[in-house]
Amino acid sequence: MFKDRKDAGIQLAKKLIGYKNKNVVVLAIPRGGLPLGAIVAEALNAPLDIVLTKKIGHPLNKEFAIGAVSLQGKYVADSAEATHRYIEEETRRIRKILRQRQDQYYKNFAPKILKDKIVIVVDDGVATGSTILATVSLIKEEEPSKIVVAFPVGSSSAINRLYNSPFIDEVVCIEVPKHFNAVGQFYRNFNPVLDKKAMQILKESNKHFIVSKYE
């Protein structure tokens, strides 16, 4: 059980300290992964960026991911209990949100270059692994030297899926509970991270690393 995302981020950073001052870029999955990603990036003396992916929630439990969407593609779990119509409607809705976030987050700054970098993908927890798997499939196209996925808590089934991914080099997880329903149950405080706060975190974290897209 974690007190909040700050507590989880501090504990996660300790697990990743071996990457300090290496050729690392920390990628947070917004919005929940950003508070943790900022703590990890600071501890490792690394720049922080985001990945524009968002989960497709189960029709009866939006917090439980049955897939994930990016601007370029989507991933849906084989066991997803949802209609094709629901998946397509959610995909359109989510892509609209992602385009808005792209405009907001990258209004003045360019995304980090990932080629030949050690990329550490951070989220606040993993229920199915769908979001991270979709994320990693996009990251791999940018030819990083290594991909690490890191999160405080995850289901055993998700951990197995991530370990079996040919694109993931290392999985770092603090807790793998026997009984797992949703990520939020393992936080005392799991309040949502609003876009305004997320953008502030990203800006503050990158004061020494940000490169303007106009340079």
Question: Which residues fall in each region the model found?
Answer:
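PRPP-associated nucleotide enzymes
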Residues: 1-215
